[in-house]
Amino acid sequence: MDLKSMRFEVFKRVERIIKTHGPRLAGTKADLAAADELYDEIATFADHSSKQDFFVYQGAFLGWIRLLVICYVIGIIFLWFNLPLGALIAGVLSLIILTLQFFLYLPLLDRFYPKKKARNVFGIIEPSGEVKRQVILSGHHDSAHIFNFFIHQPKLYNLRTTGSIATVIALVLLSAILLIFPTIPLLTLVIQIVISLGLLLVGQMWFFADKNATPGAGDNLVASSIAISLGKHFKHLRDQGKGLENTRIIVMSFDAEEEGLRGARAYAKKYANEFKKTPTIGLNMDCLYDEKELFFLTSDLNDFVKLDSQLANDLVAIAKGLNIETKTQKQAFLTGGTDAAELAKKGVKVTTLIGMPWTNDSRSNVYHTPNDTLDRVSEKVVEDALSIYQAYIHQIDQQ
């Protein structure tokens, strides 16, 4: 495998698509056009290629944020009118929405947002012999809303987000206290003032996300590009008579990852029966910026969905044999999710390779900002991803 040539191809593809289509919010014309361009290339080498259109409700995934602020303001009003039950209900409602919409990525608010068409694209490269397993190589081509908190005072990100949620929890608890002790005027006044001051923190969440999108180079067009180059590589080997014997390759570029993993969900739902018929492994990629920060996820979706720990450990061992330093890591609570979660829910053995710090306190300084450009993606991290995944696929094909 000519790593330098493949890496060059990966970068040129990403550069071309960003230059042609720009930022790509799911469901926009730019997003669909980028998907079509990826599909056109996949169709040149895949044995079978396909587009999967589905609907996304634009803006719904982050809709819980402003609802949280609105419910908090309503709670304050109820408190000042000495109606703690109303404040309690407002706080509990906002926490329910937060839990279902963000912690679990359920489509609670979708019906209230504009319905747009989105598009997954993928291709299949068959092995030379009987299919005994299939491997999904995946990234996503949509880009994220700009997160203003990562631009303005990013060191306060954790305080602003986690602190805001904690303040809403305080609204619930203190409202409950007032229901238990309704006849203590000083207690009532103190709680009213404390919760009102909390609006200074919670109110900032209204401005959490910008209407504009990032260029989306590292998050996550480069991953889709790596998947395509690996697909072309395996097709080329087969054409030379050196192809995979029993392993089918599926090259996948999901849409709407940034809208709550909706593209991966649509794909996993449609092909769930195929996953049962043929043992399926998912090699997902996301946020590949820095080779010094490489790790494989063992859980996803705010740590609510378990990924395949054995697969992650096997990939770490492969990387070690290639002198590439990696590790395994759980998805931290409140840090979101990747497309691997939706595949795991349908029984796919899957992990995600990530190349940046992934905690509430530390992320790449270009993540979800206008600076998510190709020059921020390390050449080495792309070569490492290519090396690890092709080596692993060759290894399992020999089993």
Descriptions of predicted regions:
Residues 23-126, 148-180, 185-192:
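A non-catalytic alpha/beta surface segment that caps or lines the substrate-entry region
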Residues 3, 7, 32, 36, ...:
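A composition-biased, non-transmembrane "mature-region" signal
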Residues 127-135:
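Proline/glycine-enriched tight loop/beta-turn segments at coil->beta junctions
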Residues 9-12, 16, 33, 37, ...:
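Extracytoplasmic/secreted proteins, especially bacterial periplasmic and envelope-associated proteins
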Residues 1-30, 45, 208-213, 362-372, ...:
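N-terminal capping segment at the start of a domain
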Residues 91-94, 98-122, 130, 143-148, ...:
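Acidic/histidine-rich catalytic neighborhood of metal-dependent amide-processing enzymes
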Residues 23, 53-55, 291-399:
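Active-site-adjacent substrate-binding region
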Residues 135-137, 252, 281-283, 349-353:
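Hydrophobic/aromatic beta-strand patches that form the interior of the parallel beta-sheet core
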